[in-house]
Regions:
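Residues that form generic nucleotide/phosphate-binding pockets
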Residues: 2, 15-19, 75, 79
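Short, small-residue-biased leader/transition segments that mark boundaries at the very start
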Residues: 3-8
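Alpha-helix initiation and N-capping motif
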Residues: 9-10, 69
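Active-site flanking loop/helix segments enriched in acidic
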Residues: 10-24, 39-43
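Surface-exposed loop/turn and secondary-structure junction residues enriched for glycine/proline
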Residues: 15, 19-20, 27, 51, ...
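An amphipathic alpha-helical micro-motif enriched in hydrophobic residues
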Residues: 28-36, 44-65
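C-terminal end-helix/capping segment
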Residues: 67-81
Length: 81
């Protein structure tokens, strides 16, 4: 998969893949909590920063779990059809 090959060049991303789905999922949870905290506090810039981390880690999790953006698009289309 091209996306994973590109990501593996990044040492941090490579380490995440090495640690597996459970560790990546934990990281997604942490980033989600941090995003929510900043949103509730009204810290727009900090929320954007944390949301960026959340999206990044979610994309890594999807890849590690064998899912793709196309899978998400298909699910959303199914729900709204």
């Amino acid at each position: 998969r091209r996306q994973r090959q590109m990501c593996i060049r990044d040492r941090y991303t490579s380490r995440l893949f090495d640690r597996g789905v459970n560790k990546i999922a934990q990281k997604v949870g942490e980033e989600a909590v941090e995003t929510v905290i900043e949103a509730v506090a009204g810290n727009r810039e900090a929320m954007i920063y944390e949301a960026s981390d959340l999206v990044y880690h979610l994309l890594v999790l999807l890849e590690a779990a064998g899912c793709s953006i196309a899978d998400l698009e298909a699910e959303l289309a199914r729900r709204h059809s």
